[in-house]
């Protein structure tokens, strides 16, 4: 009877040890963090122009015209990953208002978030395509990796003509 009890006890301990050894690994979920992140596409969704015109009576007037996709006046953007710059080679018209621009960004698969650096501070703002951005000066836009520990910073410039088309400028 004691041998049977000892045999049953040993069998129970070995079985329990075998079952418990499997529990540790399956309860842990492993995640792979990718450091590669990039902005892969940028386009302007909406931008305003301040159009100057002369009325029939000879007075000057200004009205605002909003350009949206798929306007032919909205340029494409070049993304230079080596120099970390984004810019338009075809300048926007002179009367374009760069202070409130809606843009759309596409990012690589493993990008965790996109943030825009403030104009007067190092504060970062989460990018959304529904918030306008002031591009009167070049802006830094950061694409972070999936766990937000590393980022790639791009210097984004929206170019516009410096003088009105068809005007003569003397220095």
Regions found by a protein language model. Give the residues of each.
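Bacterial N-terminal signal peptides that target proteins for export
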Residues: 1-9
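C-terminal motif of bacterial Sec signal peptides marking the signal peptidase cleavage site
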Residues: 18-21
